[in-house]
Amino acid sequence: MSKTRGSLFVRLRRLALRAILAVLGVWIAGILLFSVMPVPFSAVMVERQFSAWFSGDFRYVAHSDWVSMDEISPWMGLAVIAAEDQTFPEHWGFDVAAIQKAVAHNENSRRIRGASTLSQQTAKNLFLWDGRSWVRKGLEAGLTLGIETVWSKRRILTVYLNIAEFGDGVFGVEEASQRYFNKPASRLSASEAALLAAVLPNPLRYKASAPSGYVRARQQWILRQMRQLGGEGFMAQHKLR
């Protein structure tokens, strides 16, 4: 009996190890492949789609339309950097100062403040499931290091802008621009880009199509930050265009 149990344990352990290695292989292949190829869909898109189907909503479709950085207004890249990660060109995937501030804030507040960089958000949205856990955070850190090592900053920003969620079923800046402004992403103004960036903390709660007072205030704050960073010159200076 003990031999049978031991044998079963060994088989299960081998199976688990193979599964882990297979997932790691897929992630490594994805990092290498998506360094040059358009991303057809992200883990978040798949999760949202299956969640809708399982809840009986068969009308939901996760829409996305890949575009290159040359087809995205420079204001859009600047807006998300101003809103989400102002040290994006300098760090290697993690903003240590922001993490320290978030930890100090979270120790004394009920409202949780995040400190994820654009690189971390890209890794999470592209490869991982939604939610909060130490396991997911650990995987996110490893994947972030992977894309920071293999991809350029321009590539990270390109992928981020193409898979970010901007509303219910709206993924990527091209889809968002067409949906909310009836124009391609290449023609977004600074104000429109700031409005899209303003909903990114919670695109299912905040609406670009019907912006609340909070979203409008955040839009104006983002515009001020964009000017302080140096406007379009910031993007050229850091070779993000």
Swiss-Prot record:
This is Biosynthetic peptidoglycan transglycosylase. The keyword Membrane applies. Belongs to the glycosyltransferase 51 family. Peptidoglycan polymerase that catalyzes glycan chain elongation from lipid-linked precursors. Keywords: Cell inner membrane, Cell membrane, Cell shape, Cell wall biogenesis/degradation, Glycosyltransferase, Membrane, Peptidoglycan synthesis, Transferase, Transmembrane, Transmembrane helix. The chain crosses the membrane at residues 19-39. It is a single-pass membrane protein. It comes from the Bacteria. HAMAP family: PGT_MtgA (MF_00766). It catalyses: [GlcNAc-(1->4)-Mur2Ac(oyl-L-Ala-gamma-D-Glu-L-Lys-D-Ala-D-Ala)](n)-di-trans,octa-cis-undecaprenyl diphosphate + beta-D-GlcNAc-(1->4)-Mur2Ac(oyl-L-Ala-gamma-D-Glu-L-Lys-D-Ala-D-Ala)-di-trans,octa-cis-undecaprenyl diphosphate = [GlcNAc-(1->4)-Mur2Ac(oyl-L-Ala-gamma-D-Glu-L-Lys-D-Ala-D-Ala)](n+1)-di-trans,octa-cis-undecaprenyl diphosphate + di-trans,octa-cis-undecaprenyl diphosphate + H(+). Its EC number is 2.4.99.28. One of its GO terms (biological process) is cell wall organization. InterPro entries: Glyco_trans_51, Lysozyme-like_dom_sf, PBP_transglycosylase, Pep_trsgly. It is an enzyme of class 2 (transferase). GO terms for cellular component: peptidoglycan-based cell wall; plasma membrane.
